[in-house]
Amino acid sequence: MINFIHIKNDLKQVFRDPIMSVLLFAPLLIIAIFKLLIVFLFPFIATKFNFDLSLYYQYLMAGILILISGMLGIVIGFMMLDDKDGNIAELMAVTPLGRSGYLVNRLSFSSILCFIYSIIAIYVLNVIDVPFYTILLLSILSGVYSIIIGLLIFSGADDKVKGLTFAKGLNMLGIFAFSDLFALNWFSIWFLVNIFQLSD
């Protein structure tokens, strides 16, 4: 069961770190920037250069969802690295919450935010027309991806400096979402774009 007191404490921990604070709200800024680009810049490019970027909106949406997941995954990874330094996980193991409860509360923090941000991104940008169940599925997948990124950072890095380097490498995986543009079908991370295409 998710303990909302722990989530409140997680927010306090995030706000004490400038990097995590920026990463927590950066998805909203990214959504706003791309909305402005879609409304003002993309029509200008289509008129001026006769290049229709709307053909690539599916890839744009997939990239934004992966970017949001990656950022929130870094946040949860950094929080768990802080806990590792302070031996918080070991202390939680002897409390009624337990180690499994600690992990559920930690990982739910990023996955819930990622779920909410993903829904906001899809509705605010409004560049794809997909059923509501597809939006829910994509948002859930984004939340799961953020958990995976966070756990990989936690398991592969000893401190935040190494964690940031590790995170950059992990988030490079997002480029595989655009492999369909190069007709390289052997790339594995293509499900987000294919879900959009199958929903049309």
What do these predicted regions represent?
Residues 110-151, 155-156:
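Secretory targeting signals
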Residues 1-21:
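N-terminal Sec/SRP start-transfer signal
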Residues 80, 89-92, 124, 153, ...:
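Hydrophobic alpha-helical interface/terminus motif in multipass membrane transporters
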Residues 16-43, 59-75, 168-179:
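Hydrophobic alpha-helical transmembrane segments of multi-pass membrane transport/permease proteins
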Residues 21-24, 60-61, 104, 108, ...:
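Hydrophobic alpha-helical transmembrane segments
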Residues 56-94, 99-121:
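Hydrophobic alpha-helical transmembrane segments of multi-pass membrane transport proteins
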Residues 40-41, 46-53, 179-200:
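Terminal transmembrane helical anchor/hairpin motif
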Residues 140-181:
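A structural motif at transmembrane helix-loop-helix junctions in multipass membrane proteins
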